Regions:
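Surface-exposed loop and turn segments in beta-propeller and other repeat-based domains
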Residues: 30, 34-44, 85-96, 135-141, ...
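Beta-strand-rich domains and repeat architectures in extracellular enzymes and scaffolds
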Residues: 38-70, 272-286
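Repeated scaffold domains used in trafficking and secretory/extracellular systems
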Residues: 47-53, 95-103, 141-153, 203-205, ...
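Beta-propeller blade signature
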Residues: 74-77, 167-172, 293-307, 346
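Asp-box/WD-like beta-propeller blade repeats and closely related beta-sheet repeat scaffolds
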Residues: 115-155, 159, 186
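Loop/turn-rich, solvent-exposed surfaces of beta-rich toroidal or solenoidal domains
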Residues: 261-302
Length: 347
C-alpha cells in the first residue's frame, strides 16, 4: 500500500531535515524493553509483499499484496520452507488482484479489499489451513474510491476518498450507506476539500474489536490514531490522538495532490487488538534520517479502548506487522528485513 500511495500522491519531496525528536507524550507512561524471539524465516516461502497476517496454532495465514484467487495463503510454521498450503495460489487464467486492508474480525475468516474494483473478498480460515480456498465477495458502494475496509457479520466499515465523511458504514443487512465523522485536521492547511483530506489520511490501518462494537483507525504517514464506537445511530468518536501531524505540500488545482516531505514522521505500521487492549506498532521515524528504516517499527504502544495510552514497549528488531494469537494470548510480529522472520514478543 505504501508504494501505491507514492504513485498516487506524487512521492516524497526534499526539504530541510529535522533531527529525530521523540514524542513527549509517549514518555509520560511506563516503558519496557522486551525480547523478540525469532521463530521462523519466511523468505523461502515465495510470498512477497505481505499485506497482513494472522496466526492460529502452527499455521500462519498470510495476505499477499497480489493474488489471483482469494486473499490469503497458509504457511506451516513447523516447516516454513515447505510448500505453501494453498491449492489455488496461482490460477493462470485469472488476472492478479491488487489487495489492501488484510483483516480478520473474528479469526474465522480473513478479508482484503481490491481497491481497484471496490470488492471486499473474504476467505474462510478453516479451509485455508487445509489448502482449500473458499471465496465470497462483497461489492462496496460503486462510484467511490475505497481504500481500507473491515467487516463483521452485519456491516462493513471503510475509508476512501470520500467527500461526505471520514468513514463509510455499509449495512450488510439492508444495504444502507452512511458517512460518519469528520477527517482529522492538518494545521498547515486549515482549509482543504474533504476529498483532499481523504487523500492525506488514505494510508490507514483499521481494526475492529472482537465484539464488533468498536474499532481503531490509525494513519501510516502521521501520528493520527482514532478510537471509535459503532452504534445503531452510526459511528461515534471516542478519542482522536495526534502524536504528530503530517508534513506535506498540498495543491488542489488543477487536481488534488499530496507530497510528503522527507522530514515527515511516519506513524503506525500495524495494529493488533484484543477485547481489552490495542497494540499499535509506531514508527515515529523520518525518511530524511532513517531512509527505508522509517517503514518499520521498534516500538509498540498499548492503549485501552477509551484511547488511553497505558504503556510502551521497545525492541531491537524492526517490525512491519503484528498479530495477536487469541488461543495463546501472545503477540507475534513479522520483521522488516529480507528474512521476513516471524517473532514472538515477550511482553
Amino acid at each position: 500500500m505504501k508504494g501505491i500511495l507514492y504513485v498516487l500522491f506524487g512521492g516524497i519531496v526534499s526539504a530541510a531535515s529535522d533531527r529525530y525528536l521523540d514524542d513527549e507524550s509517549l514518555n509520560t507512561v511506563k516503558s519496557e524493553q522486551v525480547e523478540a524471539i525469532r521463530l521462523a524465516d519466511l523468505s523461502q516461502t515465495g510470498i512477497y509483499g505481505i499485506n497482513g497476517f494472522i496466526k492460529q496454532g502452527n499455521r500462519l495465514i498470510v495476505g499477499p499484496t497480489y493474488m489471483q484467487e482469494g486473499v490469503a495463503q497458509t504457511i506451516d510454521l513447523d516447516h516454513p520452507a515447505g510448500k505453501v498450503l494453498s491449492s489455488k495460489a496461482v490460477v493462470s487464467s485469472k488476472p492478479f488482484r491488487t489487495l489492501s486492508a488484510f483483516n480478520s474480525w473474528d479469526g474465522k475468516s480473513v478479508t482484503a479489499l481490491d481497491f481497484k474494483t471496490g470488492e471486499l473478498i473474504e476467505n474462510a480460515v478453516s479451509p485455508l489451513t487445509r489448502g482449500i480456498t473458499e471465496t465470497s465477495v462483497i461489492q462496496l458502494p460503486r462510484g467511490e474510491q475505497h481504500l481500507i475496509a473491515a467487516k463483521t457479520n452485519d456491516f462493513v466499515i471503510s475509508t476512501g476518498f470520500y467527500g461526505e465523511g471520514r468513514y463509510l458504514l455499509y449495512s450488510l443487512v439492508d444495504g444502507s450507506v452512511r458517512y460518519c465523522l469528520s477527517y482529522p485536521d492538518c494545521p498547515d492547511y486549515p482549509v482543504l476539500q474533504e476529498k483532499t483530506k481523504g487523500m492525506l489520511y488514505a494510508s490507514s490501518i483499521l481494526r475492529l474489536r472482537p465484539d464488533g462494537q468498536a474499532f481503531v483507525c490509525a494513519d501510516m504517514y502521521s501520528g493520527m490514531i482514532d478510537f471509535c464506537r459503532v452504534s445503531p445511530e452510526g459511528i461515534e468518536r471516542v478519542k482522536l490522538e495526534q502524536l504528530s501531524y503530517p508534513r506535506v505540500e498540498i495543491s488542489e488545482t488543477p487536481e488534488p495532490q499530496v507530497l510528503y516531505r522527507k522530514e515527515n514522521r511516519f506513524g503506525f505500521m500495524d495494529i493488533a487488538v484484543t477485547p481489552e487492549r490495542i497494540y499499535a506498532l509506531y514508527s515515529g521515524k523520518t525518511y530524511a534520517r532513517d531512509r527505508q528504516g522509517a517503514f518499520v517499527s521498534n516500538r509498540l504502544l498499548e492503549y485501552d479502548w477509551e484511547g488511553n495510552l497505558m504503556q510502551t514497549f521497545n525492541f531491537d528488531v524492526g517490525l512491519r506487522g503484528i498479530t495477536y494469537d487469541e488461543d495463546e494470548g501472545l503477540l507475534y510480529g513479522i520483521t522488516g528485513d529480507s528474512k521476513m522472520s516471524v517473532v514472538k514478543l515477550k511482553l
